């Protein structure tokens, strides 16, 4: 069973993603705290991380968390898809530089999300 970690400060966004991915039979683990992501990845061992760029009132941001994951031997091989409401070329470039496998713009539809995950994980 595929496991996806959803890290987003929006309860609503996490719920939408959970419903979408659960409909595929995938296991979903969640956090609204960016600082908790590295430990979640080490313990839950997800196949993929969906990581928001901006966490209101929190430091680090999603870019920092992605860099942390990619810099740690235990978590570097877990693919990350960054999620953002901002369509700025600089953000897309920073996500790639941080090691993200993809950058998905909010709002996105269920099919777009599922296809992005399947593409990154090379699933049919």
Region annotations inferred by a language model:
Residues 25-34, 40, 104:
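Short hydrophobic/Thr-rich beta-strand motif most characteristic of the beta2 strand and flanking loop
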Residues 15-23:
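Charged docking surfaces used in two-component/phosphorelay signaling
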């Amino acid at each position: 069973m595929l496991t996806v970690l959803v890290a987003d400060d929006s309860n609503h966004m996490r719920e939408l993603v959970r419903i979408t991915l659960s409909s595929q039979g995938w296991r979903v683990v969640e956090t609204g705290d960016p600082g908790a992501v590295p430990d979640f990845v080490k313990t839950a061992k997800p196949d993929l991380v969906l990581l928001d760029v901006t966490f209101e009132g929190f430091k680090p941001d999603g870019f920092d968390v992605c860099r942390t994951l990619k810099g740690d031997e235990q978590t570097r091989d877990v693919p990350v898809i960054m999620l953002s409401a901002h369509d700025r070329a600089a953000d897309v470039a920073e996500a790639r530089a941080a090691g993200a496998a993809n950058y998905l713009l909010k709002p996105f539809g269920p099919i777009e999300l599922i296809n992005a995950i399947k593409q990154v994980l090379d699933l049919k």
